A protein has these predicted regions:
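Alpha-helical scaffold elements adjacent to nucleotide-binding pockets in ATP/GTP-utilizing enzyme cores
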Residues: 4, 26-28
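Charged, amphipathic alpha-helical segments
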Residues: 48-75
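A short, polar/proline- and glycine-enriched secondary-structure boundary/capping micro-motif
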Residues: 42-49, 105-109
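Short beta-strand segments
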Residues: 22-24, 43-45, 92-97
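Short, solvent-exposed loop/hinge segments that bridge or flank secondary-structure elements
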Residues: 13-26
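A short, structured loop/turn motif at beta-sheet edges
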Residues: 28-30, 47-54, 87-93
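Acidic/histidine-rich, surface-exposed loop or edge segments in extracytoplasmic proteins
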Residues: 29-43
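Short, well-ordered, aromatic-rich surface patches in folded extracellular/luminal domains
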Residues: 1-14, 67-155
Length: 155
């Protein structure tokens, strides 16, 4: 059973294409329960069951993840990256994806920010401590505040 998955892939790929820039999958298996892919190179890791339970409890603490719709936003331009998430606490499971959710100049997306925050927490509290390298961003994107253009031009 997949407990956590974070995947970044080019938005122009078909959904079933195996290529991805980065993917990490954490399962409830006893052996090789953390699988990472960097540009289609597969790496297997084994972490203790207690660490898997920590991931489940982090996800359980953010129960609003299970109410996120399947698609965070539509892909109107086939450009940039697609971000996909799977979260499971052992009982409930939800998966969703979004396109270009880290771009500057776009309005912040509450659900994407929540998912990235939880992924970052899993990275910092479990994966990093067990020596699993990931490409989950450690800092969340900061969107610049909108400023209304001024009619007064100062020269």
């Amino acid at each position: 059973m997949i407990i956590f998955e974070y995947k970044v892939s080019p938005a122009w790929l078909s959904p079933d294409a195996p290529e991805s820039i980065f993917r990490i999958t954490v399962t409830s298996d006893k052996e090789n329960n953390v699988i990472t892919w960097f540009h289609d190179k597969k790496y297997l890791h084994t972490i203790p069951t207690s660490e898997i339970n920590k991931i489940k409890s982090i996800i359980k603490d953010h129960s609003e993840l299970f109410r996120v719709p399947e698609c965070l936003e539509s892909n109107t331009v086939l450009d940039g990256e697609e971000y996909s998430f799977i979260f499971s606490d052992g009982k409930n499971t939800n998966s969703f994806s979004g396109f270009n959710i880290l771009d500057y100049g776009r309005s912040p997306r509450k659900n994407a920010t929540l998912a990235l925050r939880v992924a970052r927490t899993i990275k910092e509290k479990v994966l990093d401590l067990n020596g699993v390298r990931t490409m989950i961003p450690t800092r969340l994107q900061r969107w610049p505040k909108y400023r209304k253009p001024s009619n007064d031009i100062k020269i």
